[in-house]
Amino acid sequence: RSAGEVSWRLALIVVIGRIVLNESPSDMLAGLVRAFGRDEAEAGALACRILAHRGSIDPRCPAPGFALDGRIFVAPGQLAALSGTDPDLLAALMPHVTVHSGAFGIDPGAATREALLAVPGHSPGLVDHFLARRAMRAAQGEDASVYDMLPPSRYLTASPGEVFTIHAEAVLPGGTVQRVERVVRLTGEPQRPWRTLAWRSQPPRRLPAPR
């Protein structure tokens, strides 16, 4: 880019393609952790801590040793407050979790590879084959449902297309990067077609100097 020019990058993400912290069952939560190469013990432990935070009981989880919190997550970043959470794992999970869709499952038409791998019974080969076919349909402009390309599962659901995350990234002159994220819900009301559910801004950072 030329001196003095500001470059922008925008991304629109369907929220229901993410794992929902307040609704998803323990096997989905653990599956997402395993998608990042963590073992069964670590995946199960984090899933149980998430359930304990929201006051859910799973017979596969050990007794927490404290009163269940019974609180909902209001932002994905609250995962950092759970004891024993690995910061590197937390950073990896953030793009694949949400608190806004309120759905039990995920929409395969919008889900990331990692979210699809969290579904019980989904192997890497199955997911990669599905993603290739999904991309092919999109490239051909086909609007047909993608549900016929995966085995039936109670963890897959249709998206009403009401909640979206908008990512905006600006690279300013001098190499400073500013990122903001807004979560919006479409209302269907002409006077107020959308409303903001969340707004997050990351501290500015500088790009490394070219070598």
Where are the regions that the model predicts?
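Compositionally biased linear targeting/interaction segments
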Residues: 1-211
